[in-house]
């Protein structure tokens, strides 16, 4: 279990992280390259792994609207891997309107992933306006990457999509917020293997983990929590405190 370097604030964690952090040119370009390769691989051989079931479960919960595409706001969706999973599983006959909300660097780099059903936005309001009626807000593993997780969660809740699914997100059981620098390998970011021309190396970025109590309080302002997801009890640690990954399935 990796131990993150505890910090006093997001700003301190950002300063102690690798240059660029989540918007590092190397990190962003690798994630997009891996997503393009992932799309080609699934087109040639449609085989999904177990983690892909998170995306498929969210789609099943969203249902299928009549007479229009299924409309999904994918918060922190990287290079669009969740869309690729959905498109592979559902096929071209099931129309999708998918908006990924990401960093400006990712939105710019992910231009080759756009295909008429998938688009990228660095502004949540712009993504909402593009989608119109939102059937599902889907969030996988990005809330703890935000400088102010509670504020971003409040904005997601305020969209009032009929279904809200959170998965692979870091929470702490105790009160308050903890900040850290989290380390990983370049190869672990994005789906599939590294491009053969890219050497693996260490990367680091800020993490902000808020309490389950805070998360559930925000969710309950508009939603009923149907299910709590306990996915990984000790995904990593911060200053020796185990941090869990989990999520929620919510309905208006």
Where are the regions that the model predicts?
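Class I SAM-dependent methyltransferase Rossmann-like catalytic core
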Residues: 15-68
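A short SAM/SAH-binding and catalytic strip from SAM-dependent methyltransferases
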Residues: 135-149
